[in-house]
Amino acid sequence: MIKNFMQELKTQRWDDHRYYHHSRINQSLHFVSAASFLFAYAMLFFDPVVSALVGWLVSMTSRQAGHFFFEPKGYDHVNHATHEHKEEIKVGYNLQRKVVLMTIWALSPLVLYVDPTLFGLFTPWADPADFMRQVAKIWLTIGLGGLLFRTIHLFFIRDVETGLVWMTKILTDPFSDLKLYYKAPLALMKGELIDPGLEKHVKHA
């Protein structure tokens, strides 16, 4: 059982890399995201508010910017797949689902501004610092909620193992991405916009 779980984790991680991380800019942003996520993980034990602010404002924005703005959207000649096919088979949040998640995140401060109690859940914020700390709590909830929602969703549309593997992958991605993409910034500075190693690795996979 453990062996199958680890193999499925390896497969999900490899598919995510080969389908959705061709751009060196995207890879570099994932490296930045991974480093800041690890800082956010550490801060979770000391100050969850700071953890949420770093996790969303630095880690998530840099990570998603890479996917939205820099990853090629045309035909994938390495994997022989259209962009539409890759979006359809995406285990986690594809671009359409990410738009929904990021929209909820971006609009949440506005909801708190309009209703300082957030439907009676909070004591009304008294100053900008208090406002940001309450926003951070909302963002932390959105992050955890997004993770659990897709995990449970996968239980029903795939199976329990796929959902648990995906959740494990997401939580451990910062460690994996640091190892996987630490060379990307240097390659980018040398003018390399697309990872040339993907085609070789896909052919031998």
Label each PLM-derived region with a short phrase.
Residues 46-71, 145-157:
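Hydrophobic alpha-helical membrane-embedded segments
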Residues 39-54, 110-137:
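Helix-coil boundary and interhelical linker segments in multi-pass alpha-helical membrane proteins
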Residues 11-41, 86-101:
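Membrane interfacial helix-start motif at the N-side
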Residues 104-124, 191-203:
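Alpha-helical transmembrane segments and their membrane-interface junctions
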Residues 40-43, 65-74, 110:
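Membrane-helix exit/interface motif
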Residues 1-17, 68-92, 151-205:
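Membrane-proximal soluble regions of multi-pass membrane proteins
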Residues 31-42, 61, 141-144, 148-151:
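Hydrophobic alpha-helical transmembrane segments of multipass integral membrane proteins
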Residues 94-117, 178-186:
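C-terminal halves and exits of single transmembrane alpha-helices
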